[in-house]
Regions:
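Short coil/turn segments at secondary-structure boundaries
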Residues: 50-54, 60-67, 73-80, 84, ...
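Iron-sulfur cluster-binding cysteine motifs and their immediate structural context
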Residues: 16, 20-42, 60, 65-92, ...
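Ferredoxin-like iron-sulfur electron-transfer modules
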Residues: 1-17, 30, 46-68, 311, ...
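A generic short-segment signal for beta-strand/edge and adjacent turn/coil regions
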Residues: 11-16, 34-35, 44, 219-220, ...
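A ubiquitous short alpha-helical element
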Residues: 26-31, 54, 108-110, 378
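Iron-sulfur cluster-binding electron-transfer modules in prokaryotic oxidoreductases
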Residues: 4, 82-165, 170-425
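Residues immediately within or flanking Cys/His clusters that coordinate Zn2+
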Residues: 12-18, 22, 63-73, 215, ...
Length: 425
């Protein structure tokens, strides 16, 4: 009856209800609710599989009350792919009930008061408008918020993106290779300074940078919310855009986009379609420490006098198993005081922007607060992270407590170190 859930039966039976997930699951630690912990969610999905439970509103709320951070997956003693079970349950909900029926379960679209979540909803609304055709089901769900001005205050260059679509990011003489830059919606619309840093760093290191004009968002948000068809549409569009660009490598500075392109595209399109594309995709930190650049510690770098700490994005650390590359970049920069944060790998509750933009915003902030004491204990002036969604989440959490910190991507700090050392000012 529910074929998408049925596909997860082998994973479901691996769960022995041991309760180890209660130690690790951020939503459980923030709520102490059994339905919030992975064990409880698997029990509910199993009940649907056995015909003991329908796809009710309550079931849907429980399935969407998960950050999809993979913390439990990487700590499960029986290696249950918990995140896949939950994502498949969401996909079944979308297929069986439709997006319009789930709209008010996923999103709080009330307009009675000023809410921080309106920024997130307006961003996602813009993402839908920019990337999806008019007949896509998501278009019929709009508006998700009428607080456009909330977004305009967050959006630094909405009408003037950091890259001219259709142009090249930058020419260099005798380039090492031609690199395609996948920008991603969050960097394109919220943090264009990260995008400019990517282009500047790659040019300084003798790479030609191409920004394909027809690239769209990675599709991470849509696949995570259970819409496989839209995720597949976006995956095909991006694969085609970069194939036409004929690049040697594809880099992105948004770790959620890297995760989606490396793993999500295989899920929605299959290995045969994505094999060539996947072989070219790199998170920018991975690319810069992969040997294609050469040893960063041998590259002329000027001192950067900052005291920094590092928050590890779940998509990069748990999803892609790439904990080291960002820290290798920081370690290579002279003058930088890098203070390791206790619990750097702890989830911030953003869910790559997806969890924090829905009805779970308040819960996401409660999860983020676990990081507060650890951040403050470092006495760092700058928090470095490889995910723009983590940056927004943690900066909002700190601001709610009256604390302001500078946030930078590893590539921005590398840009500072290269500036001047390469004769670029």
């Amino acid at each position: 009856m529910y074929e998408l859930i049925n596909q997860m039966e082998d994973e479901i039976v691996k769960c022995v209800r041991c309760g180890v997930c209660r130690i690790h699951c951020p939503t459980f630690l923030a709520t102490n609710a059994e339905s919030a912990v992975s064990r409880g969610k698997i029990y509910l999905v199993d009940a649907v599989l056995k015909g003991e439970l329908e796809l009710t509103d309550e079931f849907a709320r429980d399935m969407y009350r998960c950050v999809n951070c993979r913390t439990v997956t990487v700590n499960c003693p029986t290696s249950v792919q918990v995140h896949n079970i939950i994502l498949q349950a969401r996909a079944q909900l979308v297929k069986s009930r439709g997006l319009s029926d789930l709209r008010d379960i996923i999103f709080d679209t009330s307009t009675n008061s000023e809410r921080p979540v309106d920024k997130r909803l307006a961003f996602f609304q813009e993402e839908i408008s920019r990337n999806l055709p008019s007949d896509n089901p998501w278009q019929s769900l709009l508006p998700l918020t009428d607080k456009k001005r909330e977004f305009s205050s967050l959006l630094k260059e909405l009408e003037n993106p950091p890259f001219i679509k259709g142009g090249k990011g930058g020419f260099v003489d005798n380039p090492k290779m031609k690199v395609g830059y996948f920008v991603g919606s969050a960097i394109d619309m919220m943090y264009p300074e990260i995008g400019r840093a990517v282009v500047n760093v790659l040019k300084a290191l003798d790479f030609e940078v191409i920004v394909p004009p027809d690239q769209k968002c990675s599709g991470y948000s849509f696949r995570t919310l259970g819409d496989i068809d839209t995720a597949a549409y976006l995956a095909r569009a991006n694969i085609e855009a970069f194939a036409e660009a004929d690049v040697d490598a594809i880099v992105t500075a948004d770790s959620s986009c890297a995760l989606e392109m490396k793993q999500g595209y295989v899920e929605v399109l299959g290995e045969k379609v994505t094999e060539e594309f996947n072989g070219k995709v790199y998170d920018i930190s991975e690319f810069l420490t992969s040997g294609k650049v050469g040893a960063l510690n041998l590259t002329p770098l000027r001192q950067v006098s900052k005291k920094v700490t590092y928050h590890e994005a779940c998509a990069l650390g748990k999803g892609l198993k790439m904990s080291d590359p960002p820290k290798e970049i920081l370690d290579a920069i002279p003058g930088l005081e890098f203070v390791e944060m206790d619990g750097a790998e702890l989830c911030c509750g953003s869910g790559c922007g997806v969890f924090a933009m829905g009805r779970n915003y308040d819960l996401s902030m409660k999860i983020a607060e676990r990081k507060f004491d650890n951040i403050m204990a470092t006495e760092a002036d700058v928090v470095v992270t490889s995910c723009p969604h983590c940056q927004l989440q943690l900066s909002e959490m700190l601001a709610s407590k009256g604390v302001e910190k500078e946030f930078l991507h590893p590539v921005q700090i590398l840009e500072m170190a290269l500036r001047g050392a390469t004769g670029d000012g």
